[in-house]
């Protein structure tokens, strides 16, 4: 299966008649493996800051998580495994695997829990596959 199919079929999937706003799979070097057409252009330093928070949990909390110039307030995640952020009625979930970052961005009517399930389920599967 191609990386684009993982984004299209597993991250941008139907969720009770809705879907994520945007999604991507990135390498831990910040390279784009695959992304939805709606995924925002991001800066390398934004990905570097996200990776730093996975290595040193809590580093994003004081400043917020930035992706594509959008600031998200960091909310409870799973240290070293999942970072979650909130902005208004939407937010972001980032799951780290051994080789990649899976990113899902949502807005109402998709709920934070629905985004978490979609992103983390695929991340867990990729971890089981050694990716």
Curated annotation (Swiss-Prot):
<dbReference type="GO" id="GO:0003785">
    <property type="term" value="F:actin monomer binding"/>
</dbReference>
<comment type="similarity">
    <text>Belongs to the profilin family.</text>
</comment>
<comment type="subunit">
    <text>Occurs in many kinds of cells as a complex with monomeric actin in a 1:1 ratio.</text>
</comment>
<dbReference type="Pfam" id="PF00235">
    <property type="entry name" value="Profilin"/>
</dbReference>
<keyword id="KW-0206">Cytoskeleton</keyword>
<dbReference type="InterPro" id="IPR036140">
    <property type="entry name" value="PFN_sf"/>
</dbReference>
<protein>
    <recommendedName>
        <fullName>Profilin-3</fullName>
    </recommendedName>
</protein>
<keyword id="KW-0963">Cytoplasm</keyword>
<dbReference type="InterPro" id="IPR027310">
    <property type="entry name" value="Profilin_CS"/>
</dbReference>
<dbReference type="InterPro" id="IPR048278">
    <property type="entry name" value="PFN"/>
</dbReference>
<dbReference type="InterPro" id="IPR005455">
    <property type="entry name" value="PFN_euk"/>
</dbReference>
<dbReference type="GO" id="GO:0005856">
    <property type="term" value="C:cytoskeleton"/>
</dbReference>
<dbReference type="GO" id="GO:0005938">
    <property type="term" value="C:cell cortex"/>
</dbReference>
<comment type="function">
    <text>Binds to actin and affects the structure of the cytoskeleton. At high concentrations, profilin prevents the polymerization of actin, whereas it enhances it at low concentrations. By binding to PIP2, it inhibits the formation of IP3 and DG.</text>
</comment>
<keyword id="KW-0009">Actin-binding</keyword>
<keyword id="KW-0020">Allergen</keyword>
């Amino acid at each position: 299966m191609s990386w684009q199919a993982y984004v299209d079929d597993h991250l941008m999937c139907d969720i009770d008649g809705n879907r994520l706003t945007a999604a991507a799979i990135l390498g831990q070097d910040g390279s784009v493996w695959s992304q939805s057409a709606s995924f925002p252009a991001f800066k390398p330093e934004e990905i570097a800051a996200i990776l730093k928070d996975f290595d040193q949990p809590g580093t994003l909390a004081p400043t917020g998580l930035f992706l594509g110039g959008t600031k998200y307030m960091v909310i409870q995640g799973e240290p070293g495994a999942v970072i979650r952020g909130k902005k208004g009625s939407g937010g972001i979930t980032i799951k780290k695997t051994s080789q990649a970052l899976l990113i899902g961005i949502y807005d109402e009517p998709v709920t934070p829990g629905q985004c978490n399930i979609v992103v983390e389920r695929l991340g867990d599967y990729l971890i089981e596959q050694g990716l």
